[in-house]
Amino acid sequence: MAAKLRAHQVDVDPDFAPQSRPRSCTWPLPQPDLAGDEDGALGAGVAEGAEDCGPERRATAPAMAPAPPLGAEVGPLRKAKSSRRNAWGNLSYADLITKAIESAPDKRLTLSQIYDWMVRYVPYFKDKGDSNSSAGWKNSIRHNLSLHTRFIRVQNEGTGKSSWWMLNPEGGKTGKTPRRRAVSMDNGAKFLRIKGKASKKKQLQAPERSPDDSSPSAPAPGPVPAAAKWAASPASHASDDYEAWADFRGGGRPLLGEAAELEDDEALEALAPSSPLMYPSPASALSPALGSRCPGELPRLAELGGPLGLHGGGGAGLPEGLLDGAQDAYGPRPAPRPGPVLGAPGELALAGAAAAYPGKGAAPYAPPAPSRSALAHPISLMTLPGEAGAAGLAPPGHAAAFGGPPGGLLLDALPGPYAAAAAGPLGAAPDRFPADLDLDMFSGSLECDVESIILNDFMDSDEMDFNFDSALPPPPPGLAGAPPPNQSWVPG
């Protein structure tokens, strides 16, 4: 038994080990050249093994069928590579229609004649001529006739007959035309026109800058907002924020200009809703007290409201140049020319400045000394009729600018409990400006058009009533100044 099994066993040559046959469903299929090489190697191995075998092995060799060639096994199962674009061949519908029209003697066919040519000459459509199976390809033919520009439609001379389809003598496009997009918000003609106009307008309004304009020595052309000059103030805007906001507004006129250029008060209230603006003249660039260069434009009352302590606060936010220079500025000097100071609509501008240096006392008033007397609390320059009765004060407050000691100060007429503070001599007032806070720096430099500012900023409201004709307490004998002007502004 063992001898029989040993006789049926075939010694395997180590150089030609059995190779596994690839599965028929293997993907990707082996390349033909590789399959041929494997077949040749396998056939040579089998023949060489058969020659080396003995008679017994030659007899048993047919029992083990040789591995079939890979090409014979895989060839029938492999799909032939086809370059056919459609089921009927490589020609498209447009190509078939072109051949049908060219085959006609007069180079023109009706739609039904094109259908007949398809069924007659294209094998794929021979069994699809009935109405049930022809709906799809006939619809495709109609679409191609209308889609391509190489086909033109010519009206038939006979009545009630379909039109002729001919080839475009000018050629026309052979490919598909780009599909039109539906009109939407982004590609509508009206939207594109508006967008183009807006971009052109923005380019025209944008100031042309050269690369050298970015240096500090070359300021950018165009109006510079007043807020940009006082970048450290609370109400100022950063340059980039202003540019973005001005760009959003359309880049028009400057919003913070002179008071006469403002056409309405809404823009003014939007920028500084709680405080008016002070517009000193450009002549205030040089301070007579310090003898040095000061900013060309004094801060607005929106920036001075907090630092001067209009509501009882200190003077920590005052510009350092003014505070430092003021300490060395006081002392005997000639009396400068008095200038008017415009008070805020709600408060006296410099009323609470005495609290800036509370530790330094002031000497009693003497005519040569430059010290000032100030009010302990800000006093309303204008009082609405309803507010006057509620506060227990006299009807609308009265104010007048009069000359006084060197560097004259604007004092409000004090109604009610504050009358004694201004009626008596200034030396008797309990609160005074500290000696180190010299206001001579403002003397002669606060030139402004009072009437223009009053008309633009204060007279727009019908509830305001200004009357500067009322009698003021006589000034103390030590004060040498002009009498109060008898002039009234009544809103019309």
UniProtKB/Swiss-Prot annotation:
It comes from Homo sapiens (Human). Pfam families: Forkhead, FOXO-TAD. GO terms for cellular component: chromatin; cytoplasm; nucleoplasm; nucleus. Residues 88-182 bind DNA. Residues 1-76, 163-235, 315-338, 466-492 are annotated as: Disordered. It is found in: Cytoplasm; Nucleus. Residues 192-203 have a biased composition (Basic residues). One of its GO terms (biological process) is regulation of transcription by RNA polymerase II. Residues 472-486 have a biased composition (Pro residues). The modification Phosphoserine is found at S184. Phosphorylation of Ser-184 is be important in regulating the transacriptional activity. Transcriptional activator. GO terms for molecular function: DNA-binding transcription factor activity, RNA polymerase II-specific; RNA polymerase II cis-regulatory region sequence-specific DNA binding. This is Forkhead box protein O6. PROSITE patterns: FORK_HEAD_2, FORK_HEAD_3. Residues 225-235 have a biased composition (Low complexity). Keywords: Activator, Cytoplasm, DNA-binding, Nucleus, Phosphoprotein, Transcription, Transcription regulation.
